[in-house]
Amino acid sequence: MDLFNYFRRETSEVNIGAVPLGGPNPIRIQSMTNTSTMDTEACVEQAKRIVDAGGEYVRLTTQGVKEAENLMNINIGLRSQGYMVPLVADVHFNPKVADVAAQYAEKVRINPGNYVDAARTFKKLEYTDEEYAQEIQKIHDRFVPFLNICKENHTAIRIGVNHGSLSDRIMSRYGDTPEGMVESCMEFLRICVAEHFTDVVISIKASNTVVMVKTVRLLVAVMEQEGMSFPLHLGVTEAGDGEDGRIKSALGIGALLCDGLGDTIRVSLSEAPEAEIPVARKLVDYVLLRQDHPYIPGMEAPEFNYLSPSRRKTRAVRNIGGEHLPVVIADRMDGKTEVNPQFTPDYIYAGRTLPEQREEGVEYILDADVWEGEAGTWPAFNHAQLPLMGECSAELKFLFMPYMAQTDEVIACLKVHPEVVVISQSNHPNRLGEHRALVHQLMTEGLENPVVFFQHYAEDEAEDLQIKSAVDMGALIFDGLCDGIFLFNQGSLSHAVVDATAFGILQAGRTRTSKTEYISCPGCGRTLYDLEKTIARIKAATSHLKGLKIGIMGCIVNGPGEMADADYGYVGAGRGKISLYKGKVCVEKNIPEEEAVERLLEFIRNDRKELEL
């Protein structure tokens, strides 16, 4: 893979109805219904809305045999109205259901964590190598008949691994690790290869974007080692709703798409399924602007490890770099200095004029030729002002620098000026490639100056800024290269929206926390309560609790697992019933839905008496 130049990974083509995936085909977009699969009319109408919005596949939860059989009626209902969209059956826990679904759906998704292995109990199991091999044989014996049914019916499959539903067997041998998630997938892929079954799509998802990106990168490397080129389905599970869901999805999915990985995506929002499609389309279209871009002559630094990156070693300059959290620099060249206390930038770039009224606790950056050394202000130079920078005595200096301006003279200057923070700029179609190339050159030269990534936008819609900036910054954060971000928007959006987006990106990348985090699933036919209203009520009561993580899950398929690092959880337990969790431990079961939100808040109050609820 080329870190600096965009090329899509070459994958095998998979036939899914009349909409093939992988190979030379475009990146496909899909969603999943949240209606009961036994309600044919509701499923048909929702599937139509997904297709009308631009969805190319529709997935439906398939809990049992009767739901699997009803896929035929849903298919008939759609086709009778001219909707030829392929249907995907989503199967957990019961391989018999997958056998039936394969006769009626164009694709069947199975979960290796619960296909043959027992449901996860979070207990550590001990296996000898012989016993472990016997468990693999059990998978083979059950999986091969399913593959034969798929061959007979020309049905594709997705092997869909979820971080939240790894089996106890995998957890016991590999732990809760990317390696375990990859091996969970590879056990099934090796059987597919041995059985000459190639209509396979794979996915490895997590609500933790760091885990998701690292694991997909590792999976691709392992597949390449074993001569496999199956196409990838990308998604961030439990991404949430609103701004959080969009940023989190764009950050994780976008980081992989920008590296050419991914053949279909699903943006999992806790909103109406059809609302996911325009977000996914914007995400894909933005990434594809990189196609056929001018070549970037970057060189990978010897110490960089793409599969397991660590934070780049930098020298701390005041509160930037070293062990400090990534900073946020905000633009206020228009003289408007007001900030949201929850998202107060560390530095404000004021350009050529220092505002008369300044925000307390915020430091200001001025262009170097007008900087006069006033307390709480710092100079910013461009690459043509190196002599001026050498004459300046400030203990913190900023240097705006595009990759192509990184000359031997600039490198020599940085070697004698460790107090300089580089602000990496790019107007290249593949700005990720240029930002990476700049930092890798610094690393190769042994320079430890911190790097802040600057990106210019001209957006009038918050969603557009959220998607584009998260795509641009994602891989830089996951690569461990980011000491700060600077989003500069010349559209009509308020400074508050731009600032919140910057902080949201850092939180989604798990590098800096500025607000409550919600791990909420998009819901499906297994969700038997009003997910969107519940999320809104919980957010209204807890959004001020910075650093708290709350999981809001439709059902137990991924619930306890994906909430493993959440402080508290709210999980559907049946029609009208909710269970509450502290971490992954259930503390109350089968609470009536109408009482559950208040019971959750009451539990948090009693457990965290220092919090104001």
Swiss-Prot record:
Its EC number is 1.17.7.3. [4Fe-4S] cluster binds at C521, C524, C555, E562. Pathway: Isoprenoid biosynthesis; isopentenyl diphosphate biosynthesis via DXP pathway; isopentenyl diphosphate from 1-deoxy-D-xylulose 5-phosphate: step 5/6. It is an enzyme of class 1 (oxidoreductase). Binds 1 [4Fe-4S] cluster. It holds the Pfam family GcpE. It catalyses: (2E)-4-hydroxy-3-methylbut-2-enyl diphosphate + oxidized [flavodoxin] + H2O + 2 H(+) = 2-C-methyl-D-erythritol 2,4-cyclic diphosphate + reduced [flavodoxin]. InterPro entries: Dihydropteroate_synth-like_sf, IspG_atypical, IspG_bac-typ, NO2/SO3_Rdtase_4Fe4S_sf. NCBIfam families: ispG_gcpE (TIGR00612), PRK02048.1 (NF002534). Converts 2C-methyl-D-erythritol 2,4-cyclodiphosphate (ME-2,4cPP) into 1-hydroxy-2-methyl-2-(E)-butenyl 4-diphosphate. HAMAP family: IspG. This is 4-hydroxy-3-methylbut-2-en-1-yl diphosphate synthase (flavodoxin). The lineage of its organism: Bacteria, Pseudomonadati, Bacteroidota, Bacteroidia, Bacteroidales.
